Amino acid sequence: CVAQTSEWEQEGSTNAVLEGESDPEGAVSWGSETQVSDEGGVEGGQGFSEPPEEAKLFVGNLPYDVDSEKLAGIFDAAGVVEIAEVIYNRETDRSRGFGFVTMSTVEEAEKAVELLNGYDMDGRQLTVNKAAPRGSPERAPRGDFEPSCRVYVGNLPWDVDTSRLEQLFSEHGKVVSARVVSDRETGRSRGFGFVTMSSESEVNDAIAALDGQTLDGRAVRVNVAEERPRRAF
């Protein structure tokens, strides 16, 4: 499975935030979508024209009592909200602390990022960034490269070990393996590691939720691990 950042499809497990709680086996329920008209009223969605892919935003670190309607209200300050959705655990029916918002235009989406990324809401700083469109050039090429569900995790705090790294990513799906790379002589962490998830969607979710998040004062980097090309014999 070759990964992109988050996709706008209601399938599989999805992104969660650093402070979010672990979900059993990555169970996810997509909350009811709130679609908003130009007048600001909630519509049933009939005759709805799909907005630009680039106008879709990932919103992380939400307070757990924020529902889709309240999420839409937060983004009203940036323009017309077309779709707002908070993601829920399908087993507990509890918010997973993140969601998605689609603005009417790309310009309004950019304004929303400027206004609301880092915005303090009930003691939690929101994470707002653009969700990569489908068919993004970030998709790894096929052919000589072997597909991978492995991600590189950089700029880790020095005291983060393999166990904590695995726990961090388990909030976003099933972790197949996790490893913090250590110095062979000293045994100390080298500040980076690798995590393998069980599916492409979980890789996408983890990247969207964790890349750039602050962990113990350090902004963690998360991206698809590069695969070495197969050797020809």
From Swiss-Prot:
Entry-linked SMART domains: RRM
Residue ranges occupied by any RRM domain in the UniProt entry: 55-133, 149-227
Region (Disordered): 1-52
PROSITE patterns noted in UniProt: RRM (PS50102)
Entry-linked Pfam families: RRM_1 (PF00076)
Keyword RNA-binding recorded: yes
Polar residues bias spans: 1-16
One annotated Gene Ontology cellular component of this protein: chloroplast thylakoid membrane
GO BP term, pick one: mRNA processing
Chief location category: plastid
UniProt GO MF annotations: mRNA binding
Cellular localisation: Plastid, Chloroplast
Function as written in the Swiss-Prot or TrEMBL entry: Probably involved in the 3'-end processing of chloroplast mRNA's.
PANTHER family found in the cross-reference section: 31 KDA RIBONUCLEOPROTEIN, CHLOROPLASTIC-RELATED (PTHR48025:SF3), OS02G0815200 PROTEIN (PTHR48025)
Protein name: 28 kDa ribonucleoprotein, chloroplastic
